[in-house]
Curated annotation (Swiss-Prot):
The keyword Transcription applies. Negative regulator of class I heat shock genes (grpE-dnaK-dnaJ and groELS operons). Prevents heat-shock induction of these operons. InterPro entries: GAF-like_dom_sf, HrcA, HrcA_C, WH-like_DNA-bd_sf, WH_DNA-bd_sf, WHTH_HrcA_DNA-bd, WHTH_transcript_rep_HrcA_IDD. It comes from the Bacteria. Keywords: Repressor, Stress response, Transcription, Transcription regulation. SUPFAM superfamilies: GAF domain-like (SSF55781), Winged helix' DNA-binding domain (SSF46785). Belongs to the HrcA family. GO terms for molecular function: DNA binding. GO terms for biological process: negative regulation of DNA-templated transcription. This is Heat-inducible transcription repressor HrcA. It comes from Chromobacterium violaceum (strain ATCC 12472 / DSM 30191 / JCM 1249 / CCUG 213 / NBRC 12614 / NCIMB 9131 / NCTC 9757 / MK).
Length: 340
């Protein structure tokens, strides 16, 4: 169990290291405002912190640097979050207005990178059920019908239906009008249940067409592949902690390009309540063992549909990055929900 003095020194050491990137010597710590301890006392406390695995001594320096475990304790128990400055908040609010989901996601990714100087990442929206705005059927040829489905998100899906019999254009118009009149604005799952229970009220063949259309729409939308939008990966070239190792940096860019590891990591963040932080090896991605990933889920009308965040070095200003990610997630949620 760490005493208050040890916690105070660990906090001071990590804040100093985050600020200038140089290993922190005991003498430097003893001279910081509020420490009021001798160099000898500070050395003893630092030795204890090193034995606990919270700090380490680089071979080339007499000073100490925080370990991933030290950063974890700092973030969980010692960090003081600062309110986001008005200029940054205004930039986020001005650029995350209701728009198409694609534009909102791209804007969020770019803003996260711009405001943190790291890589901004956004897992694209995925919903267990999708509400539709309009459906239309077009006859292509005998027993071949094109279904055009427009979701409330503005997404347009075209699906080919191979039907049991040939339908006339008037029958297809009738089916489309009925669905739009009675079911528009509802999720496809709810529509499927209602169509099944209300089949007796409809002409048999038309009902079969509608049921097949709704089922195909559900299946196709469920299969839409998730994607990650990455912005500002090149900014990490300016991060001294990462750019010194070009081989590791190339591997990191490979993670951004493949996206597979990021997809899994951001999917974990979707289950979190609020901001989630992966420090070093906690991400489970070997290439990110010198990075921290700060994420937060975003919603559409209360339903979590994706995750966004920042990838940067473990030596990052967490007190600033965390509120940026948190507020961005809230604004993205508002912008996407407002559209509906």
């Amino acid at each position: 169990m760490m005493n208050e003095r040890a916690q105070h020194l660990l906090k001071a050491l990590i804040e100093r290291y985050i600020a200038d990137g140089q290993p922190v010597a005991s003498k430097t710590l003893s001279l910081l405002p509020g420490v009021e301890l001798s160099s000898a006392t500070v050395r003893n406390v630092l030795a204890d912190l090193e034995n606990m695995g919270l700090i380490a001594s680089p071979h080339t320096s007499a000073g100490r640097v925080p370990t991933a475990r030290g950063y974890r304790l700092f973030v969980d128990r010692l960090l003081t979050i600062r309110p986001l400055d008005e200029l940054s908040r205004h930039e986020l609010e001005a650029n995350l207005q209701p728009d198409s989901p694609q534009r909102i996601v791209q804007a969020a990714s770019s803003l996260l990178s711009e405001l943190t100087s790291f890589a901004g990442v956004v897992l694209t929206p995925q919903r267990s059920d999708v509400a539709f705005r309009q459906i239309e059927f077009l006859r292509l040829s005998e027993r071949r019908v094109l279904m055009i489905l427009v979701t409330l998100d503005g997404d347009v899906q075209n699906h080919l239906l191979v039907t049991e019999r040939d339908y006339t254009p008037s029958e297809l118009i009738e089916a489309g009008n009925f669905i739009n009149q009675h079911y528009a604005g509802q999720g496809l799952s709810a529509v499927a249940q209602r169509v099944e229970s209300e089949l007796k009220q409809l002409q048999g063949d038309i009902a079969e067409l509608m049921a097949a259309a709704v089922k195909l729409g559900q299946q196709t939308l469920a299969k839409r592949s998730e994607d990650v939008v990455v912005s500002g990966g090149s900014r990490l070239l300016q991060v001294h902690d990462l750019s010194d190792d070009l081989s590791r940096l190339r591997e990191l860019f490979g993670v951004f390009e493949r996206k597979t590891e990021l997809l899994k990591l951001l999917a974990q963040g979707r289950e979190a309540q609020g901001v989630n932080i992966f420090i070093g090896e906690e991400s489970g991605v070997m290439t990110l063992d010198e990075c921290s990933v700060v994420t937060a889920p975003y919603c559409i009308n209360g339903q979590v549909v994706g995750t966004l965040g920042v990838v940067g070095p473990t030596r990052m200003a967490y007190e600033r990055v965390i509120p940026i990610v948190d507020i961005t997630a809230r604004l993205v949620s508002n912008a996407l929900s407002f559209r509906e």
